[in-house]
Every structure is written in C-alpha cells, then in structure tokens.
Amino acid sequence: MNTMRFHSLTLAALLALGTGAAAAQDFVIYVTNEDSNDVSIIDGASNAVIATVPVGKRPRGLKVSPDGTRLFVAVSGAPKCPPTMDDEECEKLEADLAADGIAEVDTATHAVLRVLPSGLDPEQFDVNWTTGLMYVANENANQASILDVEKGEIVSTVPTGLEPEGVRVSPDGSVAYVTGEVDSDITVIDTATGKEKGRIEVGLRPRDIVFSSDSTRAYISNEVGASIAVIDVAASTVLNTFALPEGSLPMGLVLSQDGQTLYVANGRARTVLALNVVDGAIKSSVEAGRRPWGLAMSPDGSKLYTANGPSNDVSVIDVASFTVIATVPVGSTPWGVWTGPKL
C-alpha cells in the first residue's frame, strides 16, 4: 500500500502544532446528525453553525484527517429501532444495504468524494494514520472490518462481541479495541497481524474507549453497568472499575491533555462528569443537554462539546469553570462530535 499520503498528513499535523497559541483557536467542530442525514460544522471561535453537509443515511461515527482536509463519516442504511420497539418488530424493517459505507468529505468544498466500503451497518471506526488502515465496527454483522483507505478496499474482517460499537486504535498503533455491547467485552485486534489477540470482559454494555497518550491504559464506558473500566493494555486485564453515581449511563469519553482527568458524557443522565483517573473520584459535574452522547475537546483543551440527541443541540462546556457557556442548535438527533483544523 502507498502510505505516502498518510505519512504526509501526520507530518502536516505535527507542523501545525508549532504555529502558536493563536492557531489553536482556528478549528471547527463536526457533528453528525443521525436523523437529518447530515453533518453540522460549527466555528470554534464563534460557536455558530457555518455549514451543513449532507453525507448519507444515519451518520454516526466520524473522524478528521490529521491535516484537516478530509472528514470521514460512517453512514448506514440499517433501520433505526428505538428502545421501545421489540426485536421482532425491528427485524421486520428493511435495511438499505447500499447506503452502508464510510463517506469521505473534502472539508474545503464539502463535497462527498467517495463512499468507502465498510461492511454491514458501520457505527464507529478509527484510523491508524501511519498505516492507512481503518477499523470499522459492523454492528449488525458482529465483526470489525479492516479497510485500506488509500485503495478503498476491505482487506480483512475480525469477529467481535455481539453488537460492536466503540472502536479505538492505541496511540502507539499496536492494538485496536472494539466494544461488544451485548457480550460486555472488548475484542483486542493485533494491528500487526490483523487478527484477534484476545477478549477482555468489562462492565455491562460497553460503549466508548479512550487510551492514555502512552498507550498503557484504556478507559471503557459501561453504559448499563454505570461504570468506567480501567484496562492495563500490556496485560489485557481490568485494573479497576470506577462506579459512577446512581442513574449514570456513560457514553462518550475524552481524556484531558495532561492525562489526569477523564471526561464522561453521561447519556440519559443528562450530565458530563470529570473524573480523577487515579481513583475515579468525581471532580466536577455539569448538566448538559438531553442525552449527551458524543464528546469532544477543543485542540487547546479548554472546551468540551457534547452531541445531545433528543434536544438537537450541542453543549459547549468551559473546562476551567465546568459550566455550559453556549448551546448550539444543529440538525436532527446529533450523535457524534469531533474537532478539526479550520482551513
């Protein structure tokens, strides 16, 4: 595979880090809107929506290339089944398999350049920008697809726990973790071989994953378990489980830039929590919108952004005061949120 493009993207991102503090404010926030089939783009300085980009059906997971020129969005033709619908009724709904894929968007023109193959019902994914490989959770197929982004081809698939959702590649690129919601486990993929390395049992209904910057620890949000699992990556074992307050339903996770604080979007509990990574003690809590799901941080670490599905908006949280300083209306049922350079 020709990895020149991905090496250059990484180099461009590193060079951007040296452009000064002012450049840290020149960013945008991308928000996937699952029911309006588009992405809202919010200016990081003004907190105003500056563009809305149609991308395909049910956009959920998203990532931005290191140089900010490409936005990748998981789109899916799988029917949306609310929690109130029983399994038999859901199974009767017809899926639009042709709508499944990863949309690649030019962030300058907002044009969808191509839709990459993804496997059935892609939900979340992550990219190793050094190798150019993308790891995609195929929720309805109970597997992860490994995609060569440059070639636009699926190179292999890996069985996972039932209903995979969260995907994250470790910063050192050695492993990819995939959450299995129903099996309450993590499938560990060895990125060197593209094979399963093992499974780690965590709490009930694991959703999201974040690694420490040195790749020694991983934190998993267990939605139904109302907890955070802390994993020793080298040993593939759970070191600790942080119990969250009663009624918590943790979803999206972000680590502070110094690695000392874990931020948790608490779903239908309508809060965002700040936890001490050593003992899980709650440092701060703030009420956000209805069901904060996706969670992202500004490049300078001073702001958090939550995608609030039922309230169709994004909460902007000032990290220092841990208060909501703005609420930004977006599309219908915002799901995921990510930040990237403003070009």
Where are the predicted features?
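Bacterial N-terminal signal peptides that target proteins for export
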Residues: 1-10
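Predominantly soluble domains enriched in secretory-pathway, periplasmic, or organellar proteins
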Residues: 18-343
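Cleavable N-terminal signal peptides
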Residues: 10-12, 21-22
